Swiss-Prot record:
Residues modified to Pyruvic acid (Ser): 25
Top-rank taxon: Bacteria
Reactions catalysed according to its record: L-aspartate + H(+) = beta-alanine + CO2
This protein's UniProt keywords: Autocatalytic cleavage, Cytoplasm, Decarboxylase, Lyase, Pantothenate biosynthesis, Pyruvate, Schiff base, Zymogen
Listed name of the protein: Aspartate 1-decarboxylase
Quaternary structure (record): Heterooctamer of four alpha and four beta subunits.
Keyword Transport annotated: no
Organism: Campylobacter fetus subsp. fetus (strain 82-40)
HAMAP family registered for this protein in UniProt: PanD (MF_00446)
A cellular component term, taken from the record's GO annotations: cytosol
Name of a matching Pfam family: Asp_decarbox
Length: 115
């Protein structure tokens, strides 16, 4: 039997843009994606600390430093400047899950990784 576990998260990222006319997804700065072990087109859950919204979308690689942009319908669920948590999950065997540690990336208000 497999269980779903937290795989990684980007904690307290700041929304830098919201593009209603884009096809969909969340655009994330490539360096943040790498730090959080996120792949392009991977499904993620977005938790908006400002308004309590929780929704799912998928990742698109961003090019701008610190970029966190919600696209398409998801753009209606956030405001620029909102603080969000970007979460990914993974299914794994219970035995592996007992020893698994998720990747947690803490960022500042400019979406720079806190060392």
């Amino acid at each position: 039997m497999e269980i779903e576990m937290l795989y990684s998260k980007i904690h307290r990222a700041t929304v830098t843009d919201a593009n209603l006319n884009y096809v969909g997804s969340i655009t994330i700065d490539e360096r943040l994606m790498k730090a959080a072990n996120l792949l392009e087109f991977q499904k993620v859950e977005i938790l908006d600390i400002n308004n309590g919204e929780r929704f799912q979308t998928y990742v698109i690689k961003g090019e701008k430093k610190g970029e966190i942009c919600l696209n398409g319908a998801a753009a209606r669920k956030v405001c620029i400047g909102d603080i969000i948590i970007i979460v990914s999950y993974a299914s794994m065997k219970r035995k592996k899950a007992k020893n698994f540690s998720p990747t947690i990336v803490h960022v500042n208000e400019k979406n720079e990784i806190n060392e």
